[in-house]
């Protein structure tokens, strides 16, 4: 039986923002959609920058040019928007019909770098592996009814908690200024991050009605404004708008994303590269299963349905294959946006569709994407720490519903002892194995 949140309605109303179906006036839908985009924008582009800056070309051993990397960032926005549309409004059995945002996954970084930096495979071999791996995961999703019985409630709860735990350092890294930056932990990063978090909390209490759930967007705007003030006043270099000018020089104001088959870097399909990445797609499937479960339990107040699991994983896989066709990296459901959905209870698909369309629009106008990308990491960190914690909270609520017996104790204990423990070891636990094994498991609690 469908809950009141899921009733089939076609009307336009502000109250629909808390319902799955129906439309919301654009003056409300666009800000809430934009909030989702800002929550994931930098994380969506960062993996592309990391991998594509290091990759070599199989054809000549050279690196991708700056203009080519900019075009791939453009493609990352485009495919994330397309993948989100498929999740929101399924085509046949492909899509969950749930408020899920898709984006480029960090999970694949290690394995993709192994392939992309191998001169015998290079960028072309990496793209071929992404296409094949995406198709593989898509069919794994479509066959979910055959293996769903092994995914018990306690396992699902552990996966959701693990996702939340794995994101906690991501939020704190951002608050500190971003992982690997020279001025990490500088006072101005901490001040701007704290200011952003305080604005988020205060606006959630002060604003009334649906507007209180725009607290993350309000925090982003005020935090960004403070970062600009610090930059203009010469206090700290937190915002750099030079990327906008550089983007216009390299790809222009308007540009259509290109299929990789129409470039000089056509994909190469290598069986070894596929096997390197296939197991990571299974890990990604576990993450998406946990994220989809968190949406259903945390936002809709019910268990995950088989057709939703099947459709969600199918999009996870097939949209990754589409991403590969544009020369980009695999997609997955974005956990920070799952946290935003469960925290605000804004589940309306039309509203989140506005976010997907903003992503697609930003891909067609690269300077717009460059503007979003200028958002300081500290501002994002201040906004996301609470969202990431809310994912872990939903997992704990799911675990509370499980029967606490010896079997549950063993599953939970071993899941976190091994899963989380591996991410905390002082060295490479899998040093005796091929490097790809360590790349997959050492830094991934899920």
Regions found by a protein language model. Give the residues of each.
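Membrane-embedded alpha-helical modules
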Residues: 115-233, 354-446
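Short, non-helical or kinked segments that cap or interrupt transmembrane helices
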Residues: 71-72, 93-107, 149-158, 212-218, ...
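Hydrophobic alpha-helical transmembrane segments of multi-pass small-molecule transporters/permeases
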Residues: 29, 33-37, 130, 154, ...
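N-terminal signal-anchor module of multipass membrane proteins
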Residues: 2-99, 107-115, 119
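Generic transmembrane alpha-helix signature in multi-pass membrane proteins
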Residues: 48-52, 60, 109-118, 141, ...
């Amino acid at each position: 039986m469908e809950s009141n949140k899921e009733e089939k309605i076609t009307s336009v109303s502000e109250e629909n923002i808390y319902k799955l179906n129906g439309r919301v006036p654009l003056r409300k839908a666009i800000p809430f959609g934009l909030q989702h985009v800002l929550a994931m924008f930098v994380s969506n582009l960062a993996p592309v920058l990391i991998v594509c800056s290091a990759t070599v070309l199989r054809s000549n051993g050279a690196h991708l040019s700056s203009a080519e990397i900019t075009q791939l960032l453009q493609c990352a926005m485009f495919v994330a928007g397309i993948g989100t549309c498929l999740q929101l409004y399924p085509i046949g059995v492909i899509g969950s019909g749930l408020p899920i945002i898709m984006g480029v996954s960090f999970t694949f970084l290690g394995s993709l770098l192994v392939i992309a930096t191998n001169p015998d495979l290079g960028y072309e071999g990496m793209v071929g592996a992404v296409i094949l791996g995406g198709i593989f995961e898509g069919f794994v999703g479509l066959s979910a009814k055959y293996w769903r019985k092994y995914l018990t409630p306690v396992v699902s709860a552990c996966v959701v908690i693990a996702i939340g735990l794995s994101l906690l350092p991501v939020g704190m890294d951002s608050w500190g200024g971003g992982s690997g930056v020279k001025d990490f932990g500088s006072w101005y990063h901490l001040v701007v991050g704290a200011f952003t978090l305080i604005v988020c909390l205060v606006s959630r209490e002060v604003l009334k009605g649906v507007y209180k759930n725009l607290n993350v967007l309000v925090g982003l705007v005020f935090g960004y404004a403070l970062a600009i003030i610090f930059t203009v006043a010469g206090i700290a270099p937190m915002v750099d708008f030079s990327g906008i000018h550089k983007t216009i020089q390299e790809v222009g104001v308007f540009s259509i994303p290109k299929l990789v088959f129409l470039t000089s870097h056509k994909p190469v399909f290598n069986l070894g590269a596929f096997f390197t990445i296939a197991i990571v797609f299974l890990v990604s499937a576990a993450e998406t299963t946990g994220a989809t479960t968190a949406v259903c339990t945390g936002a809709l107040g019910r268990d995950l349905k088989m057709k939703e699991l099947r459709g969600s994983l199918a999009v996870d896989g097939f949209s990754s294959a589409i991403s590969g066709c544009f020369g980009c990296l695999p997609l997955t459901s974005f956990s920070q946006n799952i946290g935003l959905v469960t925290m605000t209870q804004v589940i309306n698909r039309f509203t989140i569709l506005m976010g997907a369309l903003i992503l697609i629009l930003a891909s067609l106008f690269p300077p717009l994407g460059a503007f979003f990308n200028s958002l300081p990491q500290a501002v994002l960190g201040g906004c996301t720490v609470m969202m990431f914690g809310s994912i872990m909270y939903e997992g704990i609520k799911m675990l509370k519903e499980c029967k606490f017996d010896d079997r549950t104790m063993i599953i939970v204990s071993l899941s976190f002892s091994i899963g989380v423990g591996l991410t905390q070891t002082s060295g490479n636990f899998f040093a005796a194995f091929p490097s790809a094994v360590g790349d997959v498991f050492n830094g991934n609690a899920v």
